[in-house]
């Protein structure tokens, strides 16, 4: 069986595309980058095109599934492997490797990742078992063992990444074997910027072979590598802060062992699926429509009106339930109502089709935690659920880029260099400053950058010698150069920043309604009162104590043990290197938000929740 040929862009071209966009961004911030030189006649289109992080999944199961059971077994899998080796998927290959102190991957890269080495040899008899503890119990660290019947299992997962094929494995947890689970590498930047040999995120299909198989009730595991989060606690803290207010994925820590070798501690995050829906809305028994909005710095899935062509929505919103025409029509209707309804009519029009209160909590969490992967910055990396009554619910998905202060990074040997770990500095990509004029509706949108283009350095900072920008989370001035900074980034991020960005209709349109804006600001202050060291500190201390030995011994980690200890310390200092700690973030951010007064003095008192 032959597959349709795919052209595979070499790794050096992907790196070159990144640097090409960085070079462009320095000089022409308001225009899209010029076309990348296409020496390959198949068309190397940069990281956002074929072969990049947002490339569509390559469907090959149907080509080799001779017994039509929906997966590849035995000789079917062997045949698919042989074909992929001859005709590789464009997303195959390890993460990017840094050059001389340069690229995003490997020692010497911008994050100064520690050198990797083989982990300790561990067997199931060496670890504690927790058979009665819930799957996401934060007081224990389970060990998850995988046995993969190939010596170079990383190369095997790389080969099948970007396809609909899972690599079969035997999983052992709490002394119980689970045969025939499926593995694949997951993530975009957490995969493409991490080299082979370092920790990469995994998705585990527990029911890959046996549809009835469950691990403590779960059919899927998401094991994350904590890319971009040296504290390792962002997902757990976001989940804990969000849980009293909206449906949010649970998270805890696990140790992963592959073919007898420890790969260190991972963050296990609950899957958004029918089981998640049934747990939070038991009356619907898991029914309804579900969408995932994949991560994309282009920020083009903000629930704004994209017209009448359903293809414009299908390219931005990934349906996870059965694709039905009526669900797409309802999603398009929601976008139409959000975008085109006058502010004075919007709440009444949305009431039957949107969980408004949940959406306001979602938006408040996004800003209070300074989520640099959030809706306010990128209009992506979130989930949508439409219940059987036709009401849409907006839910968090990616929680690992929150709770970051700006200013100098931890630095020091093995740590991030100073200037790292900045909070958002200027509006999100495509956004405008507060004083910038409204965009011309008849003018083509400008300032969009392809997926995986890199941010410009903060004003006054030069590019490093190797062409990579200083580390930071959306560092630098507004892309269009206009507008005041509205309180800067990090702990002084204005909760009303960017409300003139029509591409993020859920935010800009909801918060244009005075009564809804007032309710949103009340939620912001509620979260600020809850986000304190007295409330969250004991939990941080518990988790720090629990995983510190694992982090110290982890030979595949993406950041240093010293950074982990610094960021999770109980030190009350809010200056110098200690300013990067979670405690300092809570102190400074909560103080700013509790003292915050909106510039618009006409904000009406909040109405009672409907």
Question: Model regions: which residues?
Answer:
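Phosphate/dinucleotide-binding and metal-coordinating scaffold of catalytic cores
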Residues: 26-60, 82-610
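Amphipathic regulatory helices of Ca2+-sensor modules
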Residues: 71-87
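N-terminal secretory signal peptides that target proteins for export/translocation
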Residues: 1-6
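Hydrophobic core positions in alpha-helical repeat/coiled-coil coupling domains, especially the HAMP
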Residues: 70-71, 146
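Acidic carboxylate motifs that coordinate Ca2+ or other divalent cations, activating on Asp/Glu
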Residues: 65-69, 373
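Bacterial N-terminal signal peptides
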Residues: 9-21
């Amino acid at each position: 069986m032959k597959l349709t040929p795919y052209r595979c862009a070499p790794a050096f071209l992907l790196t070159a595309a990144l640097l090409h966009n960085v070079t462009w961004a320095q000089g022409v911030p308001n225009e899209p980058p010029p076309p990348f030189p296409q020496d390959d006649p198949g068309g190397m289109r940069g990281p956002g095109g074929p072969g990049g992080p947002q490339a569509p999944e390559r469907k090959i199961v149907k080509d080799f599934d001779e017994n039509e059971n929906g997966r590849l077994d035995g000789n079917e899998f062997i045949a698919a492997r042989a074909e992929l080796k001859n005709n590789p998927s464009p997303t195959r290959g390890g993460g990017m490797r840094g050059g001389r102190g340069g690229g995003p991957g490997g020692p010497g890269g911008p994050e100064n990742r520690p050198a990797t080495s083989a982990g300790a040899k561990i067997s199931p008899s060496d670890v504690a078992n927790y058979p009665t503890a819930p799957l996401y119990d934060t007081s224990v660290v389970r060990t998850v063992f995988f046995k993969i019947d190939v010596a170079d299992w990383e190369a095997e997962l790389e080969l099948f990444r970007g396809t609909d094929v899972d690599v079969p494995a035997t999983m052992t947890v709490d002394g119980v074997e689970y045969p025939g689970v499926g593995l694949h590498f997951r993530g975009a930047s957490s995969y493409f910027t991490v080299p082979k040999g370092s920790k990469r995120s995994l998705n585990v299909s527990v029911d890959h072979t046996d549809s009835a198989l469950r691990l403590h009730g779960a059919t899927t595991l998401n094991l994350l590598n904590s890319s971009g989060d040296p504290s390792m606690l962002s997902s757990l803290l976001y989940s804990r802060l969000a849980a009293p207010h909206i449906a949010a994925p649970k998270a805890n820590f696990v140790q992963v062992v592959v073919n007898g070798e420890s790969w260190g501690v991972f963050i296990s995050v609950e899957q958004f699926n029918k089981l998640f829906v049934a747990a939070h809305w038991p009356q619907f028994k898991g029914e309804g429509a579900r969408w995932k909005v994949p991560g994309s710095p282009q920020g083009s899935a903000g629930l704004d009106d994209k017209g009448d062509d359903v293809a414009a929505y299908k390219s931005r919103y990934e349906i996870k339930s059965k694709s039905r025409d009526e669900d797409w029509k309802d999603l398009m209707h929601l976008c139409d109502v959000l975008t085109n309804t006058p502010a004075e009519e919007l709440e009444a029009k949305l009431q039957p089709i949107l969980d408004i209160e949940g959406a306001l909590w979602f938006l408040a969490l996004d800003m209070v935690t300074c989520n640099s992967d959030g809706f306010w910055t990128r209009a992506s990396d979130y989930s949508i659920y439409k219940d059987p009554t036709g009401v849409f619910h907006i839910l968090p998905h990616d929680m690992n880029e929150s709770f970051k202060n700006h200013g100098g990074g931890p630095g020091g040997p093995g740590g991030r260099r100073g200037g790292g770990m900045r909070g958002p500095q200027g509006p999100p990509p495509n956004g405008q400053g507060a004083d910038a004029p409204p965009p011309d509706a008849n003018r083509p949108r400008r300032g969009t950058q392809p997926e995986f283009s890199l941010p410009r350095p903060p004003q006054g900072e030069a590019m490093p010698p190797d062409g990579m920008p200083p580390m930071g989370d959306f560092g630098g001035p507004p892309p269009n150069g206009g507008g005041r900074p509205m309180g800067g980034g990090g702990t002084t991020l204005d909760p009303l920043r960017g409300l003139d960005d029509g591409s993020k209709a859920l935010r800009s349109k909801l918060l244009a309604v005075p009564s809804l804006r007032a309710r949103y600001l009340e939620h912001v202050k509620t979260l600020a009162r809850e986000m304190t060291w007295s409330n969250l500190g004991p939990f941080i201390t518990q988790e720090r104590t629990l995983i510190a030995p694992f982090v110290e011994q982890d030979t595949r980690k993406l950041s240093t043990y010293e950074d982990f200890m610094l960021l999770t310390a109980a030190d009350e200092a809010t200056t110098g290197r200690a300013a990067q700690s979670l405690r300092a973030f809570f102190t400074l951010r909560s103080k700013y938000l509790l003292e915050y007064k909106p510039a618009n003095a006409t904000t009406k008192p909040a109405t009672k929740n409907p």
